[in-house]
């Protein structure tokens, strides 16, 4: 099963599904689109595919962003649908359908709980690549976890059940996967180019993404940041008041972590299906 969140990008999603249809062979693939309260409609003409088994849409009432849409999709699929593995992927073309075969091959060979798509090449410009590298380094330093993947993963049914045992997946998908599965299989992935329009990932969104991942490991972060604050506080006391600047920055960082941690809430995750407005079956073989 493939899970695709979408907000006002129907043209890209249906192009992706057409490409998925052309890249799968004997696999039985059902696709679930999570419509994150899109304000734009899509062409409702009956879609036809040669290999895909079915396509359905879960329409949400309120927009919550891709991470909450994916969490809602996982929760719905776990409680209502039959599947062996589920693959969340972005609907804009940046997660390449050509790499699905690599997921399928690993599933058939070793039946791992989790497979992640490790980025070995990105398609963005130099500035974004540089900032993304800073994000990975910062996350690694502050959490002790080196996260090289995004939403594009392959999860067994047991892995989905484990992810849904706490609220961390409501906060950060990649952070939650890393938290629950320290060891996982990987495939190599090249970041594709968007089918239509510019990337929606701004610098601010990247910073927020980094902070959310960090918040998943808030207990570890709290200890590390408090130690750093104390060290710079002592340096400020015995050496120079300028050392108060990084100490204050540490307190500000902890404040943001505490605020973001409010989304790490199992109650919100357990109640997320109340945000489903309707279900639509748009294709079935």
Language model regions located:
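Catalytic donor/gating beta->alpha subdomain of glycosyltransferases that bind UDP-sugars
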Residues: 107, 161-220
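Short, well-formed alpha-helical segments that are part of the catalytic scaffolds
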Residues: 9-23
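Short hydrophobic beta-strand elements that form part
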Residues: 1-5, 59
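Short beta-strand/loop segment that forms part of the nucleotide-sugar
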Residues: 28-38, 58-60
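Membrane-embedded multi-pass helical conduit in multi-pass membrane proteins
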Residues: 222-285
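Conserved short acidic donor-positioning loop in nucleotide-sugar-dependent glycosyltransferases
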Residues: 8, 36-38, 64
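A conserved acidic beta->alpha catalytic loop
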Residues: 35-44, 93-94
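Acceptor/aglycone-binding surface of glycosyltransferases and processive sugar-polymer synthases
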Residues: 61-62, 66-76, 85-88, 94-171, ...
């Amino acid at each position: 099963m493939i899970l695709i969140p979408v907000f006002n990008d129907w043209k890209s999603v249906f192009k992706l599904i057409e490409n998925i249809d052309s890249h799968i062979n004997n696999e039985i693939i059902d696709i679930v689109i999570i419509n994150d309260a899109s304000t734009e409609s899509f062409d409702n003409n009956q879609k036809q595919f040669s290999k895909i088994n079915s396509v359905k849409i879960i329409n949400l009432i309120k927009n919550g962003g891709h991470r909450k849409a994916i969490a809602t999709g996982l929760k719905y699929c776990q409680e209502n649908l039959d599947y062996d593995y589920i693959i969340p992927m972005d609907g804009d073309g940046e997660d390449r359908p050509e790499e699905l075969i690599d997921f399928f091959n690993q599933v058939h060979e070793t039946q791992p709980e989790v497979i992640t798509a490790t980025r070995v090449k990105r398609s963005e410009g130099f500035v974004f690549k540089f900032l993304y590298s800073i994000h990975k380094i910062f996350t690694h330093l502050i959490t002790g976890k080196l996260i090289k993947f995004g939403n594009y993963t392959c999860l067994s049914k047991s892995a989905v059940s484990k992810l849904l045992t706490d609220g961390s997946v409501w906060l950060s998908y990649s952070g939650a996967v890393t938290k629950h599965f320290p060891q996982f299989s990987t495939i190599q992935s090249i970041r594709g180019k968007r089918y239509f329009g510019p990337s929606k990932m701004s610098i601010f969104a990247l910073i927020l993404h980094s902070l959310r991942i960090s918040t998943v490991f808030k207990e570890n972060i709290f200890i590390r940041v408090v130690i750093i604050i104390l060290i710079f506080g002592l340096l400020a006391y015995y050496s120079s008041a300028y050392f108060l600047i990084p100490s204050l920055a540490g307190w500000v960082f902890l404040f943001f972590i505490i605020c973001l941690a409010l989304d790490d809430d199992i109650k919100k995750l357990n109640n997320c299906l109340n945000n489903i407005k309707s279900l639509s079956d748009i294709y079935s073989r």
